[in-house]
């Protein structure tokens, strides 16, 4: 009798708690419990400054300059590289590295010009070397290769020429210190003198990997310390670490294809971004179908394997390999709300959704069912578009 009474009381309490949740304005929790994974703990690592010039300065102080002796993203053949090196050896090489560096810089400033109008604009370093007409990226590419040919570590960076727009320039390491070199505009500073250039040159990415460990490679991307490459571990999940070399990792946006058996992603409290354009993550991590986020994360949250910016009910990122997509309630589902999810078979719009506009779901070729709640008062005839002719609308 006592056991039965206890069960009745327990059921009543649970029923009361459930009713209490139903009366709340937010029926879907912002945070979900972790799926049996230990998220990385805050280890006190430094978060990079929001100022790109200061952030890159801090990172480069911890980087082996020799890492920037590789060509990386810059396209050039061995024969072309040898020709440029021979030219410098014969004409610009001096007794000291710093004088050679200055000679290279001055030669580019004097001999290469910025293209305009209907001219052919060159970007690859050898083409710029031969034709001497380019835009800022061409200047930076040639300067990088010329420096590297003389064993002067150098890299290209992209970012903003403040007040003008997107820009490319260089960082080079000579005489045991980094220089910030902008051959397009004929200016050169020591990196430590940030006050002289940070209001003008704001880097947001660098063209090489800063750090590497047994599981990942890391770069400077979108002004953040980013997971750039994921190495095959034989596991089915990727757990983003909290830090590397004393710096907090705040971005997960691989720039190379993620290979191996991975289909799950776990983001700790440190990760703030998976890229401004999530197309890159979808393309490079095409096997991803599950996402979970540390409940302590203040920037991101996951619901039913969909990633959201905290406080925003519109999806930030939908895993490309997801097969059943369940969404938070959004009053109006706009055009291209869901697009090009080749693996999704079912979409569930949540109660609270009111309108589904034309082309809200587009080019999901394996879609079979769309669940539409009673709260939807308008659904355009083309709301589900170019998804084949086998889609069933379930109300």
Language-model-derived ranges and their functions:
Residues 209-231, 310:
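Short beta-strand/loop segment at the start of cytosolic alpha/beta domains
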């Amino acid at each position: 009798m006592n056991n039965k009474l206890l069960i009745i009381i327990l059921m009543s309490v649970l029923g009361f708690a459930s009713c209490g949740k139903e009366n709340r304005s937010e029926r879907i929790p912002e945070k979900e419990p972790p799926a049996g994974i230990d998220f990385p703990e805050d280890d006190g690592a430094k978060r990079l400054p929001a100022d790109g010039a200061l952030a890159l300065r801090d990172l480069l102080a911890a980087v082996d300059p020799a890492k920037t002796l590789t060509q990386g993203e810059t396209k050039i053949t061995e024969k072309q590289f040898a020709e440029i090196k021979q030219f410098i050896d014969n004409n610009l090489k001096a007794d000291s590295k710093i004088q050679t560096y200055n000679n290279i810089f001055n030669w580019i400033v004097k001999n290469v010009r910025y293209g305009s109008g209907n001219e052919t604009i060159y970007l690859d370093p050898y083409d710029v070397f031969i034709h001497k007409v380019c835009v800022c990226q061409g200047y930076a590419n040639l300067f990088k290769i010329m420096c590297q040919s003389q064993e002067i570590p150098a890299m290209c960076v992209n970012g903003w020429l403040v007040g003008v727009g997107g820009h490319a320039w260089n960082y080079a390491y000579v005489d045991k210190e980094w220089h910030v070199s902008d051959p397009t505009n004929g200016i050169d500073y020591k990196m430590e003198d940030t006050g002289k250039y940070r209001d003008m040159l704001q880097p947001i990415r660098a063209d090489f990997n800063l750090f590497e460990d047994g599981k990942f490679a890391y770069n400077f991307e979108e002004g953040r310390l980013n997971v750039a490459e994921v190495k095959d571990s034989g596991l089915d999940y990727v757990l983003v670490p909290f830090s590397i070399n004393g710096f907090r990792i705040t971005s997960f946006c691989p720039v190379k294809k993620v290979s191996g058996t991975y289909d799950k992603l776990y983001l700790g409290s440190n990760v703030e971004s998976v890229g401004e354009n999530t197309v890159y993550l979808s393309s490079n991590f095409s096997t991803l179908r599950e996402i979970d986020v540390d409940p302590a994360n203040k920037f991101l949250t996951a619901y039913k394997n969909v990633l959201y910016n905290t406080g925003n009910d519109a999806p930030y990122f939908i895993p490309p390999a997801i097969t059943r997509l369940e969404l938070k309630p959004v009053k109006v589902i706009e055009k291209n709300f869901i697009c090009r999810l080749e693996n999704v078979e079912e979409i569930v719009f949540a109660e609270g959704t009111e309108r589904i506009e034309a082309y809200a779901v587009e080019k999901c070729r394996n879609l079979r069912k769309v669940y539409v709640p009673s709260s939807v008062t308008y659904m355009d005839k083309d709301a589900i578009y170019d998804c084949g002719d086998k889609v069933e609308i379930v109300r």
